[in-house]
C-alpha cells in the first residue's frame, strides 16, 4: 500500500479498513454480499485535533499505525489512487486494539 498524500482536517482521521477473511473456520467461504462491513481499521493519518471554546487545540488520542475499532456506519468512504479509505471523526473510533 502506497501512503496517500492526504492530511485530515480538525478532528478527522484517515483509516484503511482491514477486510475480514473470505474463509472462516471450517472452510466455509463467505460471499461478498453476505459479509458484514469491517469494523477494524489501521490509522493512516490524523488531523491536528479540534479547537475548544478558548481556541486551544485538543489533540487526537489515536496515532498513525494504531489498529482501531470503528463505528459500523460512521465516516465517509473515499478512493485515493484506486484504494479505498475512510475518513471519520475521532468520535467514530470506538477503541484502540492493543497487542
UniProtKB/Swiss-Prot annotation:
Locate the transmembrane regions by residue number.
Answer: none
The molecular function terms of the Gene Ontology recorded here are: ATP binding; metal ion binding; protein folding chaperone; protein-folding chaperone binding; unfolded protein binding
Q: Where in the cell is it found?
A: Cytoplasm
The record's section on Pfam families has: Cpn10
Database matches in Gene3D superfamilies: GroES chaperonin
| Main localization (coarse) | cytoplasm
SUPFAM superfamilies attached to this UniProt entry? GroES-like
Q: Could you state one GO biological process linked to this protein?
A: chaperone cofactor-dependent protein refolding
Key words of the record: Chaperone, Cytoplasm
Q: Name one GO cellular component term.
A: cytoplasm
Q: Which PROSITE patterns match?
A: CHAPERONINS_CPN10
SMART domains membership: Cpn10 (SM00883)
Where would one find the signal peptide in this protein?
A: none
So what does this one do?
Answer: Together with the chaperonin GroEL, plays an essential role in assisting protein folding. The GroEL-GroES system forms a nano-cage that allows encapsulation of the non-native substrate proteins and provides a physical environment optimized to promote and accelerate protein folding. GroES binds to the apical surface of the GroEL ring, thereby capping the opening of the GroEL channel.
Subunit arrangement? Heptamer of 7 subunits arranged in a ring. Interacts with the chaperonin GroEL.
Q: Which family does it belong to?
A: Belongs to the GroES chaperonin family.
According to UniProt, the name of this protein is: Co-chaperonin GroES
Q: Which organism is it from?
A: Methylacidiphilum infernorum (isolate V4)
